């Protein structure tokens, strides 16, 4: 469970941020630095969100039941899912580069504990111009590329399915309230409020299309934190059952991070400390 969004301010500043949710105590995360690439990763540096010196930002998101990886290829570069983000950040300057490189890659299976299967992943890519694309491994190890005009992202199902659902939902949603209603906010009646990826995508689409565009870099970061606050998950409200122990496993927002592509600053807050900090 994760939610991501890009905002472009009037002064041209591009900021992109995300929440990260995962089963409690399953994965740990820390600051990542590799040359000119900075971000947040697992201690081994494999599950990475990061930005390079060109302002290219790549986020990895969970893609359960939909990621389809291939067998080793003789004609393409074989790469593991946990290697994709760092490889692209090392090789590409912008979305155009990523699109070209993606055609040369064959994403193959790997063993990566604590996952019992190859980690199912897809990727959100944003560059300094504000262009955004999605990479999804939908068959035979090939990465399918989708343009992402709203710069929003969650998890499964596929990106085209999300966009179709969002398009239909937005036809019936508005920021304008009924003037005769007893409460403000009636224009958004029907906006889904649950934590499923499909519902979160629709909420992101609504925010993307209705928020007041910030004027400055600082305003863009501030606005994006306000939006992502709506996707923050406190421990207890989302849970599953561990089939081996019978105990609840909780999902919570481990961290929220924002990359300011103009200033190259990275700011974040985590579950136990809601104060915004520089990475």
Curated annotation (Swiss-Prot):
Belongs to the peptidase C59 family. This is Uncharacterized protein A284L. Coiled coil: none annotated. Pfam families: CBAH. GO terms for molecular function: hydrolase activity. Keywords: Hydrolase. The keyword Hydrolase applies. SUPFAM superfamilies: N-terminal nucleophile aminohydrolases (Ntn hydrolases) (SSF56235).
């Amino acid at each position: 469970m994760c939610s991501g969004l890009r905002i472009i301010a009037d002064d041209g500043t591009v900021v992109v941020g995300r929440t990260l949710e995962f089963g409690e105590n399953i994965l740990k995360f820390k600051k990542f630095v590799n040359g000119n690439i900075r971000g947040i990763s697992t201690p081994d540096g494999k599950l990475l969100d990061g930005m390079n010196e060109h302002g290219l930002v790549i986020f990895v998101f969970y893609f359960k039941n939909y990621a389809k990886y291939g067998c080793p290829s003789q004609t393409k570069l074989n790469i593991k899912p946990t290697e994709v983000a760092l490889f692209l950040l090392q090789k590409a300057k912008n979305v155009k580069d990523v699109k070209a490189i993606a055609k040369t890659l064959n994403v193959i299976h790997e063993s990566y504990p604590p996952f019992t299967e190859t980690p199912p992943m897809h990727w959100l890519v944003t560059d300094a111009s504000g262009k955004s694309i999605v990479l999804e491994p939908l068959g035979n190890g090939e990465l399918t590329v989708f343009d992402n005009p709203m710069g929003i992202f969650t998890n499964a199902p596929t990106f085209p399915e999300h966009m179709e659902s969002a398009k239909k939902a937005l036809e019936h949603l508005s920021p304008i309230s009924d003037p005769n209603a007893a409460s403000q906010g009636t224009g958004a009646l029907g906006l889904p409020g649950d934590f499923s990826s499909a519902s979160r995508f629709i909420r992101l689409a609504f925010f993307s299309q209705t928020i007041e565009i910030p004027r400055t870099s600082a305003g863009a970061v501030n606005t994006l934190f306000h939006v992502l606050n709506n996707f923050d998950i406190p421990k207890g409200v989302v849970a599953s059952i561990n089939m081996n122990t019978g105990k609840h496993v909780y999902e919570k927002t481990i961290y929220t991070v924002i990359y300011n592509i103009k200033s190259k600053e990275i700011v974040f807050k985590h579950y136990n400390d809601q104060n915004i900090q520089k990475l």
